[in-house]
Amino acid sequence: MRAAALLLALLAWPAQAAWEWSAPLTVNSVRSAAIFPHLESANHRGVAVSGDTVAVVWEDNRDGSPQCYLATKPAAAAAFQPEIRLSQGDCYEPVVAALGEGRFVAAWEEAGRAHARVLPGGKVLKLSDAEAAQVTLAAAGERMYAAWAEQAGRFRRIVVARLTLEGDALSVKTRRPVEAKKPADEQGWPALAVKGDGSVTVAWEDRRDHHTVPMVSYSRDGRRFARPARLTDQASGASPEGLGAGTGAMRPTLAAWGEQGIAAVWLDKRDFLSGYDVYAALDGGTRRFGENIRVQDSFGDNMVQWHATVVGDAGGRLLALWDDARDGTPDVWLSEWDGKAFGDDVAVPAASGPGAQSDPVATLDAAGSLHVVWLDRDEAAGTRIRYARAEWR
């Protein structure tokens, strides 16, 4: 009787909701052992969804030099359409953002300058006059911004531009360095997030304290920026065993989240024996980030994490993704914020298991579906860029 009652109780217990994944698709149409695709970009913005169309950007060397490509897939299509080439000269670190109704804006570094283009149909716009790299994009409503690392004397500094769009014509409305003074050391790898009110938050890697520190600033309209503040709560000079100027942290990423929130995720080496861990900080709408939160669970201890990114939506959903090799080979993992902490790490089914799966980029669409893109490496056959979509059920 006791066993029967227990069985009935288990049957009556509601099924736990989870992500339900589509079969993975291959994005790139050309691959070989001599072609090396890259998804790395500032703020890891390699995928976007506009209307019912998903777009993916990357760089590879199929033509003998690094070039940037974009491929799209309407929701009803069974496969990605053949990719188009965005660049003419050597190209690096492309990003893409959604404009709505199946339109996108892409940006990339080419010939030492930042460029952007509306797709389909737009012409290429040179964003920077000075040497620039590591461009990124963010858009919300009528506001669209780009940021990049621009040469200013000996070092690079972060510049943010507000972009405007008339038809297919893209133009720069304002262009401002986050700090007017020339940098004392290197700045790079900017990340952007735009709130519904049009204000913009920018984060970046900064070496003014002689070790790499994620810094953050914000502006109501892209014209004047607040004094930069640290994302990390580790003070300079707090390096373990007194080695160096402080612990290292790198590649900050940002996402708009909830009604007015901004989430930041980055790689942090404060536990220097295990390499980089994934850390986060949240701004609930006060323009001030809270305490640092370790993202990965205990099964990721003593294991280096890579390529961390964060995605969020207006409904309050917030996820971090990264790759690590805790099961012997690199796999893509995700963890979701539950309002108090990040939950258990979950492997993306098609991006885990035998082989090497890494470099995730992701986005949440207007319906709450999660779109993930990653590299699936095969030394003999070449690397595939893979895509899968998930719905919460």
Task: Put a short name on every predicted segment.
Residues A17-R393:
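Extracellular, repeat-based ectodomains that mediate carbohydrate processing or recognition
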Residues A4-A12:
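Bacterial N-terminal signal peptides
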